[in-house]
Amino acid sequence: MATSERALLRTRAASLLRGLGRSRTGARSLQFRAEKERQPCWSFPMGQKTKGSSNIASSYLLQQLMHRYQELDSDGDEDQGEGEAGSEESSESEMLNLEEEFDGVLREEAVAKALHHLGRSGSGTEQVYLNLTLSGCNLIDVSILCGYVHLQKLDLSANKIEDLSCVSCMPYLLELNASQNNLTTFFNFKPPKNLKKADFSHNQISEICDLSAYHALTKLILDGNEIEEISGLEMCNNLIHLSLANNKITTINGLNKLPIKILCLSNNQIEMITGLEDLKALQNLDLSHNQISSLQGLENHDLLEVINLEDNKIAELREIEYIKNLPILRVLNLLENPIQEKSEYWFFVIFMLLRLTELDQKKIKVEEKVSAVNKYDPPPEVVAAQDHLTHVVNSVMQPQRIFDSTLPSLDAPYPMLILAGPEACGKRELAHRLCRQFSTYFRYGACHTTRPPYFGEGDRVDYHFISQDVFDEMVNMGKFILTFSYGNHKYGLNRDTVEGIARDGLASCIHMEIEGVRSLKYSYFEPRYILVVPMNKEKYEGYLRRKGLFSRAEIEFAVSRVDLYIKINQNFPGYFDEVINADDLDVAYQKLSQLIREYLGLTEEPAKSLATTADVKTSHLKPEAHPTKYISSNMGDFLHSTDRNYLIKFWAKLSAKKTPAERDSIHRQHEAARQALMGRIRPDHTLLFQRGPVPAPLTSGLHYYTTLEELWKSFDLCEDYFKPPFGPYPEKSGKDSLVSMKCSLFRFCPWSKELPFQPPEGSISSHLGSGASDSETEETRKALPIQSFSHEKESHQHRQHSVPVISRPGSNVKPTLPPIPQGRR
């Protein structure tokens, strides 16, 4: 006892001495600093201690402490032998106690502290603790657990256990966690019949033993071991989750027909994806950190939702083809693969796997999916819009001028007739026959194409056959109105083709595929679209085979597009103005010819095919009853509802009252535009600023004539405007040309039939009964010179003697254009 007290005092003295030494050193530093501070402070001379006073006090205290330490040291030397022997004995006893306390053997006291979750036993007869958690206790021997038969969940992770035979005595065990131990094998015990989850990760297991007795096992984790081959799992018919990460597996096998939903094989040495063909229930697959270079082997897994292939050797975009048909794939991770270096990687993968919601741990935005689709497989409408945009932008390369196809009247667009239909359905033959019969109205417009001519086709007759380089150059120069692709060839409608036909005062008749129709609908042209489609596909297929011009694949593709045309016509009412069955070309041409006659007004009955919707009720526009009516009962059938609505709105604008200043401004604008269209504008453009009366009638006000003599006089007043410097008949004299133009205004005016509206109040009535008798009108009409075209005579005999005429600006420019009313897009 005395020895221990002396040692304690010696220790305290030593510490005190060290503290004193530190305090002495600190005192010296403080003294030195105080001296330095006191030297310049001459303003405070009083109250300062001398330099030797502090040294005397500190030295006295130091001497006392050193003396006491020496006394304690001398006493300690006497008892040194006895103290060393006692310390050795005490240390040995302490080590023995520690060994007895941490021997790795589990005892009941520790078990009692680790039990939790009180519940009903497996037999249901008593209340017991169901869970035991002994994680991180450095346990080696857990044999005491043999008596705990009611356990259902056992956690022995992070210990040093080498034997788990005690688990054989736990028939109700459901979950076992034996991770991070020293196990070299597992399931070397009698299997609990209800064991569902087992975790043996991070042990020293080198092979998988036979688990055929573990029928109820649903989750098995064997991460971080030394397993080289998957085996022994064939009879685990309830196994859903299998994890073998961080092992030495090189080949995937031994998983035949197991109901595995989650499979983790990351951080192994796998080079090929094999052995997964029979895992039909697979939903989550982790093959990250391997050496896989191909995705082959992942096909036909319809339930696969998540694929993790991070840090592998996938390098080609074409590998995505193997997983593009997985219907519910949502998450894909290809980080740290060579494929990411591809410039098109992101949008290509999104396009191929449109159902993805997450790629490379990033959420995919809707805008990215739309951009990917528009880049690799744009919808037909997007293709048409891009084509139209391309040609509009490239058109600035051409000289800017007013096109010959630009008509001066808003309600009379340049007339075009488009025959659309599948390949070799007869639309080209119908177009040629139509242009031959109606040669004074239509001319065939040949498209440009990069394909070689078929047998019997002529260059510039059926198509303009050009090379791909020439075609691309024309696109870049902005010479096309539209282009489209069919098969492996390009087709395009040249601007010069349409303008050349319009320059001769004729309408264009063109045939094309549906792709060209879509692009043309984005332009400002408003043609009539007629669908020519064979309804009998077998007959159509036989016709293509007999021609001997197409391969089997081309024939099958052409026949398959018949349904496409029919579907478009059904899903988009009004997309085509008329549908003609092309099974019999003779019958089809008869119907087409009759339809064109009705369009041109060459028959007594107007075309009723355009009045498919109900007539618009405009009771406020109905005129009063009169023997010579202004409105025919069939006029509503002739005009489509869209046209009637346009006429109503247009008539409302024309009928609006305008101030004199507005009228003068409109007169000047229309006069300048008309002179420009006729090529009479002067270089200095001073005509735009001239003032004065406009000699031709304009749209600022409608004038109604009482007799044909008055109308004839009005033409004489503006005779100068009927003499354009160029025209379709340059060989005629000026007088004959003027007469023919006057007559053509009666015959080919789009509104030569009775108008569906009433003249405003106060205007002069245009019916002949109010100003002259029918006999006088007949004599006046016969006095007019008539052209000697037989079809015009037949058409003129069916017309009424009273012709209400609206003089439109520019109606005297191209009087030979056929009166095809405005279509709808």
From Swiss-Prot:
UniProt-recorded Gene Ontology molecular function terms: ATP binding; guanylate kinase activity
Keyword Transferase among UniProt keywords: yes
A matching Pfam family: Guanylate_kin
Extent of Polar residues compositional bias: 763-774
One CC-aspect GO term: manchette
Keyword tags: ATP-binding, Cell projection, Cytoplasm, Cytoplasmic vesicle, Cytoskeleton, Differentiation, Kinase, Leucine-rich repeat, Nucleotide-binding, Repeat, Spermatogenesis, Transferase
Principal location class: cytoplasm
Domain Guanylate kinase-like, first and last residues per copy: 414-597
Ranges where the record places region Disordered: 73-96, 760-825
LRRCT domain boundaries: 337-375
Pro residues composition-biased segments: 816-825
InterPro entries named in the record: GK/Ca_channel_bsu, Guanylate_kin-like_dom, Leu-rich_rpt, Leu-rich_rpt_4, LRR_dom_sf, P-loop_NTPase
Keyword Transmembrane helix carried by entry: no
A GO BP entry: axoneme assembly
Location in or out of the cell: Cytoplasmic vesicle, Secretory vesicle, Acrosome; Cytoplasm, Cytoskeleton; Cytoplasm, Cytoskeleton, Cilium basal body
Residues engaged in binding ATP: G421, P422, E423, A424, C425, G426, K427, R428
Repeat (LRR) residue spans along the chain: 129-149, 150-171, 172-193, 194-215, 216-237, 238-259, 260-280, 281-302, 303-324
Protein role: Involved in multiple aspects of sperm assembly including acrosome attachment, shaping of the sperm head and in the early aspects of axoneme development. Not essential for primary cilium biogenesis.
Summary of subunit composition and partner proteins: Interacts (via guanylate kinase-like domain) with RIMBP3 (via coiled-coil region). Interacts (via guanylate kinase-like domain) with HOOK2. Interacts (via LRRCT domain) with KLC3. Interacts with HOOK1 and HOOK3.
Protein name: Leucine-rich repeat and guanylate kinase domain-containing protein
